A protein has these predicted regions:
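Active-site-proximal segment of RNA-dependent polymerases
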Residues: 8-70
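Non-catalytic, well-ordered alpha-helical scaffold segments
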Residues: 1-5, 9, 34, 38, ...
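Conserved polymerase palm-domain catalytic core
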Residues: 43, 49-171, 176-187, 210
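Right-hand nucleic-acid polymerase module
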Residues: 1, 5, 116-133, 137, ...
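A common structural junction motif
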Residues: 82, 192-200
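Beta-rich nucleic-acid/ligand-interaction surfaces
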Residues: 27-35, 175-178, 209-213
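PAPS/PAP-binding and catalytic site of the sulfotransferase fold
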Residues: 7-10, 191, 195
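Surface-exposed helix-capping loop/turn segments at secondary-structure junctions
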Residues: 17, 160-166, 199-203
Length: 300
């Protein structure tokens, strides 16, 4: 892991960052989920000032994104910017463990997405006769850089070739705002061609063109405008359902002494502080009641 951090910090990031668009928001210093959400909000407000709330949002999602990044094309794309055989050899060594023996199936993985979890759970015979050199895992430094860097041709196509002003990407999630639905359809078809050239797959179930008046969801936030033109940013319901379950688990852990009451309070308030900036006051008040009920039980 130390090697990966050194490679990314000293070589890959300095070499690749100048080629990234500003609205590529993941895993970079000074950026992240909060950055991407703020940029989308800024884009929506600017769009509204220019065009009102008439228009559309194109939301695109890559299917099994990290599982389907081809090692050879990823390394070639980095090598074109770094030009160092030692770096290429390191990348080949670091990515090799993610290659999979798929000799148990004759599935054409150029036509359908590879699923590493399904592959892991499959008990078919493997004889090493067919190795799939894809997947970069999730979480490792090189994997994160791969997710940020590899779809750059899609970013360039949208921002430079198609002049999409209101465009942003967070790893495998993309949004584009425009007043012309036909234009967005044309851009989507172009992105499909770019994705095919990269060996990536677009999730048709999660890819939609939605009227702005209806609102749309991106990175777990529902964006919509009120009749008066105010932008609303509401976390999806799942956010609070999951936290309610977590609160119950924390309460049970505190009740049996595995965590302290102070830990229980700090963990909840830490989570809550991340959501107070959004339009979810009623949901937070409801969850606060659950929090206080558990806290009262712990203190008596």
């Amino acid at each position: 892991m130390v090697l990966q951090h050194a490679l990314c910090d000293a070589v890959l990031l300095p070499a690749l960052t100048p080629y990234l668009i500003y609205d590529n928001g993941a895993s970079l210093k000074g950026k992240g989920m909060a950055f991407t959400r703020a940029r989308l909000a800024a884009h929506l407000r600017e769009y509204q000032r220019r065009y009102g709330t008439d228009g559309y949002a194109l939301k695109i999602d890559f299917a099994k994104f990290f599982d389907n990044i081809p090692h050879d094309r990823l390394i070639d794309s980095i090598d074109a910017k770094v030009r160092d055989s030692r770096v290429r050899s390191l990348l080949e060594m670091l990515l090799a463990p993610y290659s999979a023996d798929v000799s148990y199936t004759d599935t054409d993985f150029d036509a359908v997405p590879y699923n590493s979890l399904a592959d892991y759970e499959t008990s078919g015979p493997r004889d090493g006769s067919r190795i799939l050199h894809r997947s970069v895992g999730i979480g490792a430094p090189v994997s994160q850089i791969a997710g940020v860097w590899y779809p750059t041709p899609v970013d360039t196509y949208c921002k430079v070739v198609r002049s999409c002003r209101y465009y942003g990407r967070y790893m495998d999630d993309i949004y584009i705002l425009h007043h012309d639905r036909d234009f967005l359809m044309s851009v989507l078809n172009g992105i499909r061609r770019q994705a095919h050239a990269l060996g990536l797959f677009i999730s048709e179930k999660k890819t939609h063109i939605t009227p702005l008046r209806q609102g749309f969801t991106f990175c777990k936030i529902r964006y919509s405008f009120t009749s008066g033109g105010r932008l609303l940013m509401r976390p999806v319901r799942e956010t609070f359902t999951r936290e309610r379950r977590r609160l119950k688990t924390l309460y049970q852990l505190a009740a049996c002494g595995k965590i302290s009451v102070t830990d229980y309070k700090d963990l909840y308030h830490s989570w809550r502080s991340g959501w107070i900036r959004f339009d979810c006051h009623r949901s937070l008040i409801s969850l606060d009641k659950t929090y206080r009920r558990y806290l009262n039980d712990l203190q008596h």
